[in-house]
């Protein structure tokens, strides 16, 4: 995943949080930066806020003991609002103002608990107070009691929905302290021993003492809290996970995100704890409404009322090596189905590919969402067939732009390594039983009619299960048979992807240079080189192709690349083709109308399939076999390279190229005089002998490497 994609995923999560959650998350991230980074961020913030007059007014009020004392005369609703806006602006060291806040907080919390009002606002106040650098150890210890009472009230309010009281109390009392105590904040080695938490000065940014962080002494044994609290996700709200109506501030119970999050790619490590929980039928209250991605910001945890013990032992395939599930969160995000990430986190790749609509219905997934999930999974099964179709299009000399766009879309989907030890012994015995229920969703959770529907669905989906793990006997396509290319087994999606990348490489090497296509191709390779589904051999091939394309790209005169856009516009005006170069047939006929000479303009574009370069049994394509014998094509190979249809990335497919091939009578080495004679004034692209030699050298190198490596993994592009 590219950096900008990672930032996009993080920004998506960030937008879904409330202000308190955003503050807590940023604070957690800032504790991981170096002193220089922290100082730089401080300068940026100070500069951007220098002219914020309203903020300066609020800050003065927030640090004035007299003004804070006057708030006691206001209504509780107004006081809560004032505290939420002013408490974060309290300056460390202002003891008088802090004392006033500590007088108000217990009153507000007691009122909220007694009348069961402003529960979420009270949580936010506790969050700010417990992480604020101005509060001391004694202050936080006193607030711990209110945290206990607050969670007790929450548990009592919603305890009728299969939720035990003890779980909520234990979690509320211990979660904050233990995730702070057990977190590894010694990442940069610049903590101090103050109990001020995190302050604006770099020297006081972090504090750490033996057995205590931010002044917190552990109140309970860390063994009482599952280890998953310290290892998964960014925030959690187990206490309210069983309630039928979702409050917008649901996750603010998590006062600080865990510190020791594993180093996972963004989109996996940033999944919240609730998004990574199982949501099985045994965890759902009978009166729970169907889940909906639009129900709330935190609806991904709405259906779970599981216990902390379940979280500690729950399997998370998103973080398992070789599971093929690491890209599922990002894939669901692109489908706007990321609220259901928890549903997939307990599945294997094969179980996900075998999902049916009835199984999703048993999990209380809404009708629209489950229909979209089933359709999306069906598209995943069709990826290998799509790759074969793209391969045929590329061989026939079609545009490269569309295949490259398809490949970019495909790499965002989950891809599992073919034939890995984790799938071979387990997945293959279940091949004929693809519709069978995954382990997460047993058959007992379905009605008889759903089972019949699942069987029917599986029967229709299995034949196209390209990458689903349900391997079917491969039928040799006409294209594969004609080209005598050894077919790849069904399910070998990385191998098929690599083969298509090789075809694209060959097309790029022999066609007119296109900066956009080359850049897109190199980005594809960069993403594949770090993907776990691809073998080392495949990655070596991809790296080799990347180097060839880069070398060829650098060998082209920069003037040619800069003039391509203007050149295309002129050609479009002359031939009436939008955003594409003319085919050989149209070029010949168009010049014939304006010029009695029947020779075509020398082109640096090289066709791929039409020149018969992609076959292994003979260098003759299907169209050329009908008109020309193989020896003739071999003899005219070099002439055809430069005068046949420019089948580059911007060419339109043409079946009439055989009628306009260059004749033998024209010399192989066209002189500059002849070149100028045949060219029209608007078609002035420099074609020099060194350019031709460089192109031939790169093409020969590519063909040789592909041919020599064809016997290893059968992903040759030749």
From Swiss-Prot:
GO terms for biological process: nuclear-transcribed mRNA poly(A) tail shortening. Residues 453-466 have a biased composition (Low complexity). The modification Phosphoserine is found at residues 168, 420, 580. Gene3D superfamilies: Smaug, PHAT domain, Transcription Factor, Ets-1. Residues 323-396 form the SAM domain. Its main location: cytoplasm. The modification Omega-N-methylarginine is found at residue 573. One of its GO terms (molecular function) is mRNA binding. It is found in: Cytoplasm; Cell projection, Dendrite; Synapse, Synaptosome. Keywords: Cell projection, Cytoplasm, Methylation, Phosphoprotein, Repressor, Synapse, Synaptosome, Translation regulation. Residues 278-310, 417-474, 572-601 are annotated as: Disordered. The modification Phosphothreonine is found at residue 424. GO terms for cellular component: dendrite; P-body; synapse. It holds the Pfam family Vts1. Coiled coil: none annotated. InterPro entries: PHAT_dom_sf, SAM, SAM/pointed_sf, SMAUG/VTS1_RNA-bind, Smaug_SAM. Belongs to the SMAUG family. Acts as a translational repressor of SRE-containing messengers. This is Protein Smaug homolog 1. It comes from Macaca fascicularis. The lineage of its organism: Eukaryota, Metazoa, Chordata, Craniata, Vertebrata.
């Amino acid at each position: 995943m590219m950096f900008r994609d990672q930032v996009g995923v993080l920004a998506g999560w960030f937008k879904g949080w409330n202000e308190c959650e955003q503050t807590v998350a940023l604070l957690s991230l800032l504790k991981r930066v170096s002193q220089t980074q922290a100082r730089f961020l401080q300068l940026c913030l100070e500069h951007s806020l220098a002219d914020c007059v309203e903020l300066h007014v609020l800050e003065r009020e927030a640090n004035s003991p007299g003004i804070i004392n006057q708030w006691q005369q206001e209504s509780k609703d107004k006081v809560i609002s004032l505290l939420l806006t002013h408490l974060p602006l309290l300056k460390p060291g202002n003891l008088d103002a802090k004392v006033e806040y500590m007088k108000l907080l217990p009153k507000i919390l007691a009122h909220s608990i007694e009348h069961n009002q402003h529960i979420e606002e009270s949580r936010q106040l506790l969050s700010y107070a417990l992480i604020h650098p101005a509060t001391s150890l004694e202050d936080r210890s006193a607030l711990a009691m209110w945290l206990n009472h607050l969670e007790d009230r929450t548990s009592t309010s919603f305890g009728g929905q299969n939720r035990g009281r003890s779980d909520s109390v234990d979690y509320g009392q211990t979660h904050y302290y233990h995730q702070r105590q057990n977190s590894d904040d010694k990442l940069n080695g610049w903590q101090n021993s103050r109990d001020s938490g995190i302050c604006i000065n770099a020297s006081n940014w972090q504090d750490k003492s033996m057995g205590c962080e931010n002044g917190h002494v552990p109140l309970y044994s860390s063994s009482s809290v599952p280890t998953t609290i310290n290892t998964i996700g960014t925030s959690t709200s187990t206490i309210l996970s069983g309630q039928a109506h979702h409050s917008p501030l649901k996750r603010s119970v998590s006062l600080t995100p865990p510190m020791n999050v594993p180093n996972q790619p963004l989109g996996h490590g940033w999944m919240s704890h609730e998004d990574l929980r199982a949501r099985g039928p045994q965890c759902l209250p009978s009166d729970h409404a169907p889940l909906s991605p639009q129900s709330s910001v935190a609806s991904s945890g709405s259906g779970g009322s599981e216990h902390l013990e379940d979280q500690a032992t729950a399997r998370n395939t998103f973080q398992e090596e070789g599971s093929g599930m690491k890209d599922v969160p990002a894939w669901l995000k692109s489908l706007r189905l990321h609220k259901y990430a928890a549903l997939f986190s307990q599945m294997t790749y094969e179980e996900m590919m075998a999902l049916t609509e009835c199984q999703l219905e048993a999990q209380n997934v809404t009708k629209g969402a489950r229909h979209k999930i089933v359709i999306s999974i069906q598209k995943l099964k069709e990826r290998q067939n799509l790759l074969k179709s793209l391969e045929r299009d590329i061989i026939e000399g079609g545009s490269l732009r569309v295949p490259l766009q398809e490949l970019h879309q495909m790499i965002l989907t989950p891809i599992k390594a073919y034939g890995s030890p984790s799938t071979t012994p387990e997945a293959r015995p279940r091949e004929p039983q693809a519709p069978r229920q995954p382990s997460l969703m047993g058959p007992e959770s379905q009605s008889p009619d759903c089972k019949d529907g699942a069987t029917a669905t599986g029967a229709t989906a299995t034949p196209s299960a390209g990458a689903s793990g349900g391997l079917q006997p491969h039928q040799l396509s006409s294209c594969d048979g004609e080209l005598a290319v050894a077919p790849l087994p069904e399910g070998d999606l990385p191998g098929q992807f690599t083969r298509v990348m090789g075809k694209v490489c060959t097309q790029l090497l022999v066609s007119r240079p296109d900066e956009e296509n080359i850049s897109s191709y190199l980005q594809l390779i960069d993403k594949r080189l770090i993907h776990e589904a691809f073998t080392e051999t495949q990655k070596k091939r991809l790296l080799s192709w990347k180097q060839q394309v880069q070398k060829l790209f650098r060998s082209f005169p920069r003037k040619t690349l800069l003039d391509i856009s203007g050149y295309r516009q002129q050609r479009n005006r002359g031939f009436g083709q939008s955003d594409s170069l003319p085919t050989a047939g149209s070029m010949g006929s168009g010049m014939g109308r304006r010029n009695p000479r029947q020779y075509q303009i020398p082109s640096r574009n090289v066709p791929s399939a039409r020149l018969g370069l992609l076959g292994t049994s003979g260098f003759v394509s299907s169209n050329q076999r009908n008109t020309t014998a193989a020896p003739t094509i071999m003899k005219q190979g070099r002439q055809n390279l430069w005068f046949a249809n420019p089948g580059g990335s911007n060419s339109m497919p043409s079946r009439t190229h055989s009628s306009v091939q260059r004749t033998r009578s024209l010399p192989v080495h066209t002189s500059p005089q002849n070149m100028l004679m045949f060219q029209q004034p608007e078609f002035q692209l420099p074609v020099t002998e060194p350019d031709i030699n460089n192109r031939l050298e790169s093409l020969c190198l590519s063909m040789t490497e592909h041919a020599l490596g064809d016997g290893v993994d059968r992903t040759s592009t030749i």
